Curated annotation (Swiss-Prot):
InterPro entries (UniProt xref): 4pyrrol_synth_GluAld_NH2Trfase, Aminotrans_3, Aminotrans_3_PPA_site, PyrdxlP-dep_Trfase, PyrdxlP-dep_Trfase_major, PyrdxlP-dep_Trfase_small
Enzyme class: isomerase
Organism ancestry: Bacteria, Pseudomonadati, Pseudomonadota, Betaproteobacteria, Burkholderiales
Catalytic activity entry: (S)-4-amino-5-oxopentanoate = 5-aminolevulinate
Source organism, top-level taxon: Bacteria
Subunit structure: Homodimer.
Identification of the protein by name: Glutamate-1-semialdehyde 2,1-aminomutase
């Protein structure tokens, strides 16, 4: 009697009660094809699926699990917090401690407000910027994903990149009114001339510029120094708010986030993922002058029943304590670079056009000769080669992001033995391409 594939059985079952069988589109394997892996448990750098098959995890919950799955210290902190209650709907000392820790690690953040998701963080930051400036227009960049708030679903990256309308201001999702996104201007990433032109024409109407300081939703794309400098100069000159969406990069690429590596001081910063240690937790913060416009002090309303959830706060505090230890990011960055060098060498050994890039514990690889620097360039990479490579690596027990438009992540638990296993799997996979 043939053994039942539990992943397939669970996927079939899930589709009866969950749209598409998943609670976030990229998990459905639509771009790569095949059956999604349903996770049963995870530890360190590994997870086991419903068939009890072990995989090396190279997405780490899309970034949050920087100290490894089920880290004993984080688990203990969560258990202790859960013993008192899962939620109060009232202030706690833990919220203050987490806010103090964030403000200490990110000097641009003078005050911070907790929320429950990255989408809430960016949505609230935009509302705050509009309330502070009294303006409506916002600028975002092609391929940057800032959550699924309506006004930001225009030319986004991630799973939507595969079917987004190419029209300048067309919504990337059904259900988003064209009338709403008319307030969103979309510009090419890394294009200095484009942003200079828009500010020259409409500078006094722009409330905010929101940017992924290292784009991670069109694979990994780094900004040029000139591009970032132009954005900071123009927003300051015209009184627009510069919002750094560090939901992905905050505490992932460096202890002070991407802004600490780039020497840029944003007006507002959005955080998530790592700051919650894998729990539903996010935040937005920045200049006290701007943050004071939030209710109950000001007239910009924002609220949430589960904001500052005590269990999530406990996970976040312990995670930030661990990543703050001496040598953490040097080790994480070194391991990521070692992995990238190994993947590149394996591709070169098999004459496969392939490039890599990384920052801290975040990486990207591309089936093309040069590292892309824009949304347009990413769309021209070899997607068919990626799909084949994804499944070959999956067969070797290595779980990559099931999309060519997503960055990858490692954790401090990815030691040399794990890296060697990944590189050996890549060598075998490249030979079969």
């Amino acid at each position: 009697m043939a053994k039942v594939d539990q992943n397939e059985a669970l996927f079939e079952r899930a589709q009866k009660t969950i749209p598409g069988g998943v609670n976030s589109p990229v998990r459905a394997f639509r771009q790569v094809g095949g059956i999604p892996r349903f996770v049963a448990k995870a530890k360190g750098s590994y997870f086991w699926d419903a068939n009890d098959q072990r995989y090396i995890d190279l997405i780490m919950s899309w970034g949050p699990m920087i100290v490894g799955h089920a880290n004993p210290e984080v688990v203990a902190a969560v258990q202790k917090a859960a013993e008192t209650s899962f939620s109060y709907g009232a202030p706690t000392e833990g919220e203050i401690e987490l806010a103090e820790r964030i403000c200490a690690l990110m000097p641009s953040v003078e005050q911070v407000r907790m929320v429950s998701s990255g989408t809430e963080a960016t949505m609230s930051a935009l509302r705050l910027a509009r309330g502070y400036t009294g303006r409506d227009l916002i600028i975002k960049f092609e391929g940057c994903y800032h959550g699924h708030a309506d006004s930001l679903l225009v030319k986004v990256g991630s799973g939507l990149l595969t079917f987004a309308d190419s029209t300048q201001n067309a919504p990337s999702s059904g259900g988003v009114p064209q009338d709403l996104v008319k307030h969103t201007l979309v510009l090419p990433y890394n294009d200095v001339a484009a942003i200079e032109e828009v500010f020259q024409k409409q500078g006094d109407q722009i409330a905010a510029v929101i940017i992924e300081p290292i784009a991670g939703n069109m694979n990994l794309i780094q900004p040029s120094k000139a591009f970032l400098a132009a954005i900071r100069t123009l927003t300051a000159k015209h009184g627009a708010v510069l919002i750094y969406d560090e939901v992905m990069t905050g505490f992932r690429v460096a202890l002070g986030g991407a802004q600490s590596l780039q020497g840029i001081t944003p007006d507002l910063t959005c955080l998530g993922k790592v700051m919650g240690g894998g729990m539903p937790m996010a935040a937005f913060g920045g200049k006290k002058e701007i943050m004071s416009k939030l209710a109950p002090l000001g007239n910009v309303y924002q609220a949430g029943t589960l904001s500052g959830n005590p269990v999530a706060v406990a996970a976040g505090l312990k995670t930030l304590e661990i990543v703050s230890r001496e040598g953490f990011y040097e080790c994480l960055t070194g391991q990521t670079q070692k992995l990238m060098a190994g993947l590149k060498a394996a591709a070169d050994n098999n004459t496969v056009p392939f490039t890599v890039d990384s920052v801290g514990g975040m990486f990207g690889f591309y089936f093309v000769d040069q590292v892309p620097t824009s949304y347009e360039a990413v769309t021209k990479t070899n997607i068919d080669a990626f799909k084949k490579f994804f499944h070959l690596m999956l067969d070797e027990g290595v779980y990559l992001a099931p999309s060519a438009y997503e960055a990858g992540f490692i954790s401090i638990a990815h030691d040399n033995a794990v890296l060697e296993e990944i590189i050996a799997a890549a060598e075998s996979s490249f030979k079969k391409l």
